[in-house]
Amino acid sequence: LSNADVPESEKDNVDFLLIRINKLIELGDFDNAKSLIDLISEINNEEILIKKTEINLSLNNFDLVCLDIEKNRTKYKKNLFWRKVEIFCQILNGETNKANLALSLLKEEKNFNDENFLKIIDSLIYKDEINDESLVNLNLLNLVMTRVANINIKESYVLNEDPLLLTMIYRMPNVPIKLRIEAIEKSKKLLNLPIETIEEIYNSYDVK
């Protein structure tokens, strides 16, 4: 990340900020990525708002995730991401009736096909048990919800290279130790892996 001059036009400025934010996330420096986003007085770029929300989801900052969710869902109503996050927030806030209504409307959308989301939401609302074998390729929101719902992730789950996912997985108690260690191994290039947490995870793994 250089000290290059910020581009003059608003669009170029937003593009420049996105490059810096994405680079910080790639390096695992989520605190500085979040600080950079927080410096923006009025965020009118949906991609930056999604990054901000994903960082807060990864760090379990649910109060911040839910803070402006109704505003974002209204403003960017074509993107189902905001509607799913809002349903999650409604459940966290004990607004089950609102969540069920929003979920019914979401299911009617032709381009909605997130079966994992539906399974995990049902588990959150009705405490249904889920066969972890059916949960694959989870996005960040769905993975966060498995933690809240205490759904165990299978040991054979295949990790991707997303820094936000990796640094979240190694801290998740519902993920097998072996998989958490794998996430740490994949995250070694990241800047902010706490040594104490890493040692605790490695020490809790029984070598057979």
Model-predicted segments: where are they?
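Solenoid-like repeat scaffolds
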Residues: 2-9, 35-44, 69-78, 104-112, ...
